[in-house]
């Protein structure tokens, strides 16, 4: 058998049926949709509509809320950091911050900065400047001879507002 001789098994792929193309095809006129009515018409059905019965999403109770003050951290584990150090993708000589972790491809998203978590082992002596750190991670970093500085990350909107305010103050003076 050669690559050009490979075929699908019999009946593995069904050919597309062209409905509504004459009575000789067996699927002409109504195209397998029955007679008149809402279900015979074209267009997408209404999502979640159950024929007038109360839909499931309305039968179930409301639950929870969206906390507008919730912090969005990019969470990075110590094991992932150690792997990057071993692969020489992270420089341990300087301070490791959000930008360095993002460049290394380990911190994705996180508009409020990076939070380091304690999963995995860290043997390298590393100093961090991050938005958050768990107690276990802090202990492991200090045990390895490193240090952690927790900084407050100012959101972009607040930075822009502060910058705009200083520009206005400079204009007045």
Swiss-Prot record:
InterPro entries: Ribosomal_uL15 (IPR030878), Ribosomal_uL15/eL18 (IPR021131), Ribosomal_uL15/eL18_sf (IPR036227), Ribosomal_uL15_bac-type (IPR005749), Ribosomal_uL15_CS (IPR001196). The gene is rplO. Residues 1-50 are annotated as: Disordered. Part of the 50S ribosomal subunit. Pfam families: Ribosomal_L27A (PF00828). This is Large ribosomal subunit protein uL15. Belongs to the universal ribosomal protein uL15 family. GO terms for cellular component: cytosolic large ribosomal subunit. It comes from Rhizorhabdus wittichii (strain DSM 6014 / CCUG 31198 / JCM 15750 / NBRC 105917 / EY 4224 / RW1).
